[in-house]
């Protein structure tokens, strides 16, 4: 297996390259009867799309979805759902000067070592263009989770370089190109990114994603833990170098009396665990965050070697994101939704006859 598929009961297989004729995916395991139309994909695909602000890549793709199979008269049939998006704004000539060079910090060298051949145009299969189809598949998962269980998956940018939110408002997240939760800071982010872009450098970021309404009981110990699969899903996103569940690495500095989430009949008093204990959901919000490294495609020269082993300086032209984290929020949401839908179906398959178990503790209460 070449690991282009994700999930067990609800599976997603993606295909295509950044500068190929098209990208696509096959979604299998979706229950029948879910209403699904091409226009339902537009919102999330446009949230992920480049060319929407001066702070992202200038590449402009229409990202119009084509449903090839698995939907009849507007409803899923239970058979594989084929989705396709045609690439229309490739500029492969921008990569001719680095076709034989390995960009430091990029997958050029590792793909070459693994396969002995690589597609240098836009990064080929290693390009974040592939995540477009993850977002498309996530649209299906988000809708099913919301309709079936009332689960709402949403995310936001929680750090850009050294800048962190000075406040939080979910309503602000969708009103700016950064998915930033504090509207008053958006001008600061604009100024920072303008200066960064002019310098030719890039910067890292952090994205938080939250799923509210997840019932207690989802997750499979020992090797199918909800948090383990969520961490793997987020780590599979391009440029991600770290993932936290709940308080994550901050837990190392906490005492047990600080970290444990006390329980009352009215609900949990905190959520340091991120809504998961023993690999199984608690009924609280499932929370995770991921850190993305700075973009490695830079206009600033950097030392490397070429395919002949000669020392060269590489300069990347073309259209690239100075901060990949700016467009990563919809991708993180999609991956969490895919994990949750797969886990929901697996839980239903094994434990659907268990029924309501008492006591059922509500989610976190305000204290």
UniProtKB/Swiss-Prot annotation:
In alphabetical order, the GO MF annotations are: chorismate synthase activity; FMN binding
Classification from the root reads:
Bacteria, Pseudomonadati, Pseudomonadota, Gammaproteobacteria, Lysobacterales
- Name the keywords, alphabetized: Amino-acid biosynthesis, Aromatic amino acid biosynthesis, FAD, Flavoprotein, FMN, Lyase, NADP
Cofactor, how bound (note): Reduced FMN (FMNH(2)).
> Know the name of this protein?
Chorismate synthase
The answer to whether keyword Amino-acid biosynthesis applies is: yes
What is the protein's quaternary organization? Homotetramer.
**UniProt-annotated stretches for the region Disordered:** 41-60
> Known PROSITE patterns for this protein?
CHORISMATE_SYNTHASE_1, CHORISMATE_SYNTHASE_2, CHORISMATE_SYNTHASE_3
Its annotated function is as follows:
This reaction introduces a second double bond into the aromatic ring system.
Alphabetical GO CC annotations of the entry are: cytosol
Disulfide bond is among the record's keywords: no
Name its co-factor(s): FMNH2
Q: Where does FMN bind?
A: 125-127, 238-239, 278, 293-297, 319
Which one GO biological process term can you cite for this protein? amino acid biosynthetic process
**Pfam families recorded for this chain?**
Chorismate_synt
- What EC number(s) does its UniProt record assign? 4.2.3.5
* SUPFAM superfamilies reported for this sequence: Chorismate synthase, AroC (SSF103263)
Assigned protein family: Belongs to the chorismate synthase family.
Question: Which residues of the sequence carry a binding annotation for NADP(+)?
Answer: 48, 54
Name the chemical reaction catalysed here.
5-O-(1-carboxyvinyl)-3-phosphoshikimate = chorismate + phosphate
Please name the pathway: Metabolic intermediate biosynthesis; chorismate biosynthesis; chorismate from D-erythrose 4-phosphate and phosphoenolpyruvate: step 7/7
Q: Which organism is it from?
A: Xanthomonas euvesicatoria pv. vesicatoria (strain 85-10) (Xanthomonas campestris pv. vesicatoria)
């Amino acid at each position: 297996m070449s690991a282009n598929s994700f999930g067990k009961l609800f599976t997603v297989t993606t295909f295509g390259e950044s500068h190929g004729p098209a990208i696509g995916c096959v979604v299998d395991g979706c229950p029948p009867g879910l209403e699904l139309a091409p226009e339902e994909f537009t919102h999330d695909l446009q949230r992920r799309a480049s060319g929407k602000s001066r702070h992202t890549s200038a590449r402009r793709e229409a990202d119009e979805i084509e449903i090839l199979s698995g939907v009849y008269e507007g409803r899923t049939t239970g058979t594989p759902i084929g989705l396709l998006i045609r690439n229309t704004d490739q500029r492969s000539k921008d990569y001719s000067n680095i076709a034989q060079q390995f960009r430091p910090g990029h997958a050029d060298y590792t793909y070459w070592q693994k396969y002995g051949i690589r597609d240098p145009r836009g990064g080929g299969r290693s390009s974040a263009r592939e995540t477009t189809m993850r977002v498309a598949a996530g649209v299906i998962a988000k809708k099913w989770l919301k309709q079936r269980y009332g689960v709402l998956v949403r995310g936001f940018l929680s750090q850009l370089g050294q800048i962190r939110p000075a406040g939080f408002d979910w309503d602000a997240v969708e009103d700016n190109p950064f998915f930033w939760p504090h509207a008053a800071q958006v001008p600061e982010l604009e100024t920072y990114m303008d200066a960064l872009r002019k310098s030719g450098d890039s910067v890292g970021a952090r994205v938080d994603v939250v799923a509210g309404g997840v019932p207690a009981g989802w997750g499979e110990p020992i090797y199918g833990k909800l948090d383990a699969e969520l961490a793997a899903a987020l780590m599979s996103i391009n440029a991600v170098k770290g993932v936290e569940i709940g308080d994550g690495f901050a837990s190392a500095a906490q005492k047990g009396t600080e970290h444990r989430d006390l329980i009352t009949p009215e609900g949990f008093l905190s959520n340091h665990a991120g809504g998961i204990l023993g690999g199984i959901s608690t009924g609280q919000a499932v929370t995770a965050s991921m850190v993305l490294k700075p973009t490695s495609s830079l206009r600033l020269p950097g030392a490397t070697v070429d395919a002949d082993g000669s020392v060269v300086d590489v300069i990347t032209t073309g259209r690239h994101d100075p901060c990949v984290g700016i467009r990563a929020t919809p991708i993180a949401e999609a991956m969490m939704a895919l994990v949750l839908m797969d886990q929901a179906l697996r839980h239903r398959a094994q434990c659907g006859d268990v029924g309501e178990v008492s006591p059922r503790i509500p989610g976190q209460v305000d204290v």
